[in-house]
Amino acid sequence: MGWPWEFLTLTDEEKHQRRLSLEHYAYIAHLSAFAPALLFVLLRLINRVRRSRSSGYQQVPGSPTIKATQQRWISRVMGKGPMIKWWLGEDVWFMGSHWGQRDEWVLGIVWTAWLLALSIHGTGKDYLHLTKRLGIVATSQMPIQYLLALKAINPFAFVLRSSHEHINRYHRVLGRIIYFLLTLHAILYNVFFIESGIWFKRFFAPIVFAGVAGFIVMHALNGTAMARVRQQSYRVFFIVHLLSAFAIPPLIYYHAPSSRFYIGEAIGVFVLDLAVRKMITITAPAVVEAIPGTSLVKVSATMPSHKIATYAARPGSHIYLNVPPASRPGTGQFSAPYLVFEFLYNPFTVASTNQETGELTFVARTRTGPMTNRLHNLSSSTNDGASAEKVELNIEGPYGTIGKTFNDLITSGINRVLIVAGGVGASFAIPLYHAVNAENSIAHVQLIWAIRSAGDATWASSTPTGKSILDDDQVQLFLTGDMGVADDSDNAAGVEMNDMAQQTTHPAVRNNKRPDLQKIVDDTFRKSQQENVAIMVCGPTEMVRELRKSVTPWVMKGRNVWWHNESFGW
């Protein structure tokens, strides 16, 4: 079968019909992007109705045989749901590199096929129709792409009861699909120009070159969005990403007038989100303290009462931190050390809140980046917060999935909770540990915390009850030694699990070795043969992989697991 498309000469009426067809298929592509979220809502409503009917009183019972058959069929289907969900949530590894999760690949392949079908259907033999269709279908996805990236007003996060850091996975998937379609669009147009002998004439025409410039910017955006680049310098990725987000829309707006509706949508939601984020950001006075004997700093910021109440109601949430002009380094407003903080908004998990004093506390490990280094430079070695000098910090939040689903965790009948943390991942785990114990006193809650040295736990020694968390029988600390917890690399969020020699530590610390996650998980499930189990983790990649691998056999046996991995991998 040969190439079906040809260079056709169309009449004005045929060109008009082609334009109508382009707009029609672009609208379909644009609106259909909301279908997955709507389908999710529909399934959730169906499940809610099914549960309410099954728990309701039936005045006239149906046939026992038919009823039993229906219940067996429904039970089988519903029983496979958690297994399928777990399978889709598994990571994909290829040649030692992480390639996202299975659900990203499934959705990405399906969505690519759908958009390619919309790009091809109805084009006939018209080569330029196919070329233009690829471009406008790709552009119709840009508002969705921007929506998926929003932090404060992300509608997909609202519908899916998630948070932007999880939705951002699909932002990356859709970005690659758009890039793929626009690459095909550019290749086909270049072939047309070359075959028609007008490449030099058309390539540098303003309307065409605007598209070329936009494509170059998109190359830079996708290049810096690669995982290796983000790990080497998140700062470069973020700055290029932000500048590209502003540069690409006006270039496409000029290049393709038919796409202006979608470009306007994209810019509108992006600017609106920035405005909302600006309004919810608090400039708070804060005390920054260095924790002696560690590379940790503890930040205690004084927040307005309404804000601190919001954070207190959402345990395990995180904030975005920005250093305002008053607290920045540099000799002037145009110096590089000063300007770099215009682009830095780093995530930190809220370790604790105190509604009486209005204090919000988070902990950071000093690394090679400018943000944690600036916090270290601002820190005071004294532990006397009253005498320490206060600095201004911009705090935006709260964010995080767990804050939205915490009520489900409490009310869903879960009887056993296992929380695993590595290093400063305990800033996520400890507030949840206290909150679950406070809200669900009958649940058995266990906290596993792996740290490099006992000094790394000093910031968490106090609890809302006044009793040290280190004296809690349900909290197990594992000291991994100097080689245990993360170094200064970006991947090292908590602990690299190696054995260490015995040493004298706090009386509550009984484990001078790496945690045996397989045994811990097996014991958790064996002690609760019929109970629902919640497992939450915040730590380095290797810890999360080992924990999930240990849980997988139990999920495949049909155990109901409420799983949450708190990570900042975007």
Question: Predicted regions span which residues?
Answer:
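Non-transmembrane, juxtamembrane loop and terminal tail segments
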Residues: 55-89, 289-308, 484-505
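Transmembrane alpha-helical segments that serve as helix-helix packing and pore/cofactor-lining elements
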Residues: 152-172, 222-239
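Transmembrane helix-loop junctions at the membrane interface of multipass transporters and ion channels
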Residues: 7-19, 191-199, 226-239, 245-262
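Helix-rich terminal scaffold detector
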Residues: 1-157, 172-177, 181-183, 193-224
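Alpha-helical transmembrane segments and their membrane-interface exit regions
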Residues: 141-145, 220, 268-278
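Ferredoxin-reductase
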Residues: 288-394, 451-452, 479-481
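Reductase modules of NAD(P)H-dependent flavoproteins
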Residues: 2-16, 166, 344, 355, ...
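Classical protein tyrosine phosphatase
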Residues: 55-61, 135-139, 168, 172-185, ...
